[in-house]
């Protein structure tokens, strides 16, 4: 298994390659990628994302558009006036109630999923979408759910999910312990 620094150093050359930005896989599959990593490297991965954004900020041909799913969720709840209500309601009715209420408020399993809409409204043609905050937003937003819903909506630009856990081309295992539903449409961004 290769070291995390070696894998991180391969991301920038990969995402700036023209074939990556054409956004098609082997059989013209949509360009969804997962960069999985040991959760203990979370801060290192976050720092490297900032580094890549800095390196590309003067390149007009492409732009990294990062969506921290946790921050997106908070912003949507705040805009809808639900954030403080959720905090108050959690104290009265408990975490399980709020978990379900928040999922419903975000419409996570419907055709008008608010997180997906938030992302699609902001994606531009020269973007490479980075999804972060996967661990922070669990269990409210599940990895496979957001990927499945985005698959229908973001098909014109490459998307990379930074995943604190393991992905073997079929199973997403958050934190190396929590098995999510299977997801088989994404490619491994950088081999381990």
From Swiss-Prot:
Key word NAD present = no
Alphabetically sorted, this entry's keywords are: Antiviral defense
Task: Outline the inducing conditions.
Answer: Part of the brxA-brxB-brxC-pglX operon.
A GO BP term here is: defense response to virus
TM ranges are: none
InterPro entries in the cross-refs: BrxB (IPR014858)
Stored Pfam families: BrxB (PF08747)
- Top-rank taxon: Bacteria
Keyword Acetylation included in the entry's annotation: no
Name the family the entry cites: Belongs to the BrxB family.
Protein role = BREX systems (bacteriophage exclusion) provide immunity against bacteriophage. Part of a type 1 BREX system. This system allows phage adsorption but prevents phage DNA replication, without degradation of the phage DNA. Methylation of bacterial DNA by PglX probably guides self/non-self discrimination. When the brxA-brxB-brxC-pglX and pglZ-brxL operons are transformed into a susceptible B.subtilis strain (BEST7003) they confer resistance to bacteriophages SPbeta, SP16, Zeta, phi3T and SP02 and partial protection to phages SP01 and SP82G (these include lytic and temperate phage).
* Protein name, entry field: BREX protein BrxB
The organism of origin for this protein: Bacillus cereus (strain H3081.97)
Gene encoding this polypeptide?
Answer: brxB
